[in-house]
Amino acid sequence: MKLPFKTQASLIVCAMLVLPLAQAATISKADYQAGKTRISDTYKTERSACATFAANARDICIEESSAKQKVARAELEHSYTAKPKDLSKVGVAKADAVYAVAKERCDDKAGNDKSVCVKETKAIHVKALADVKMGRQIGEAKTDAATDKRDADYQVAAQKCDALQGDAKNNCMSAAKARFGKV
């Protein structure tokens, strides 16, 4: 069954945005270097396979192999560092990859069909980038909320400790500081 371009692109973007939000376990430096080499070798192999195609099909093939390489590098970087910032970069790389390939596919069309295709592709790209940005902002908001909750809980504990005197108060404050990360 052949789906219209807009439906295909929407499905790709939806699939792309289902990113694991949990922090991944990091990989060793040796695995990271091996991954970089593997990605580079895979890219060279896929790129050379594109020579069998002609005209825009070759351009699409080259763009797909380049897109796969960029996404793989971003995912590898996230696997190595496990930073939320790198997870965001994975989302951006995927959005950019889908956009670049879809834009290249639009070159097969002509006239108004091509213009519509390019506009739809650009709109999908902008939406995907907005979703990545929103995910990043939600993560930051959760972090801020957790910090606010921890600070509020610390103030409550400190207030309870104020009712004590002497060593009991000092021990209580030390325990509260340790518990709520105020060391």
Regions found by a protein language model. Give the residues of each.
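Bacterial N-terminal signal peptides that target proteins for export
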Residues: M1-L11
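Repetitive helical segments and hydrophobic/amphipathic motifs
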Residues: A15-L17
